[in-house]
């Protein structure tokens, strides 16, 4: 399976981070840690929410420069909302991901941010898309990114399975974030998770001291 590693070792305030999105039977879960850092060493915030709602059932999560990511998602939300009004229907997840792709590609010389877009629509159900730094767009059943992803490729490959239940998928995502946050010095804080289905959106926040532990920390 193709996977994309988003390098977040950049100057300025960055979300040296762990982000992921996973489809399950009937929905998709998108998640991240909550730590922001400067230069990969100074922790500037422990409570950044890296999951951005761009439409009712479409979210993206960010890795890289926090300023770049906020600027791109703000522009994307405007374009996606305008598109939805024009079409008189909710936007497709792929359409939202394509907006992010165009913004990243058109500004690839200046931007230092990558994105995962996930959501649910009536045409294709749950979907996950990776938008790379240069604007490349990939559709995948699950993806991981950020500096913490280095530590969980093996876990994700071994434990992911298609058509998981919601509970199995939540456990998979929680364990993956916990493993990455336990090893990566620029991932940490709390685990933010959003469950997206036809019925709606559910937010889950797991404090750092409530995350599963797999080794002495």
Swiss-Prot record:
PANTHER family in UniProt: ATP-DEPENDENT PROTEASE SUBUNIT HSLV, METALLOPROTEASE TLDD
UniProt keyword list: Cytoplasm, Hydrolase, Immunity, Nucleus, Protease, Proteasome, Threonine protease, Zymogen
Keyword Hydrolase attached: yes
GO biological process, one term: proteolysis involved in protein catabolic process
GO cellular component annotations of the record: cytoplasm; nucleus; proteasome core complex, beta-subunit complex
UniProt-listed InterPro entries: Ntn_hydrolases_N, Pept_T1A_subB, Proteasome_bsu_CS, Proteasome_sua/b, Proteasome_suB-type
Name used for this protein in its record: Proteasome subunit beta type-6-B like protein
Active-site residues per Swiss-Prot or TrEMBL entry: 17
Organism per entry: Salmo salar
Cysteine pairings via disulfide bonds: none
Enzyme class of the recorded protein, top EC level: hydrolase
EC number: 3.4.25.1
């Amino acid at each position: 399976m193709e996977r994309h590693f988003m390098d977040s070792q950049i100057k300025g305030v960055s979300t040296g981070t762990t982000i992921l999105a996973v489809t399950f039977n009937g929905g998709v879960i998108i998640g991240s840690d909550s730590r922001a850092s400067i230069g990969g060493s100074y922790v500037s915030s422990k409570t950044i929410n890296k999951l951005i709602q761009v439409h009712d059932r479409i979210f993206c999560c960010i890795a890289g420069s926090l300023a770049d990511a906020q600027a791109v998602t703000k522009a994307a939300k405007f374009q996606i909302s305008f598109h939805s009004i024009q079409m008189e229907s909710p936007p497709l997840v792929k359409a939202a991901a394509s907006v992010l792709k165009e913004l990243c590609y058109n500004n690839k010389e200046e931007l230092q941010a990558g994105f995962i877009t996930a959501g649910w629509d009536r045409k294709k159900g749950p979907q996950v898309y990776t938008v790379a730094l240069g604007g490349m767009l990939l559709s995948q059943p699950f993806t991981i990114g950020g500096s913490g992803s280095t530590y969980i490729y093996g876990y994700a490959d071994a434990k992911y399975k298609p058509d998981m239940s919601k509970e199995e998928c939540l456990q998979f995502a929680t364990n993956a974030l916990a493993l990455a946050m336990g090893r990566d010095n620029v991932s940490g804080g709390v685990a933010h998770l959003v469950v997206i289905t036809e019925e709606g959106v559910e937010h889950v926040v797991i404090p750092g001291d409530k995350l599963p532990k797999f080794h002495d920390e």
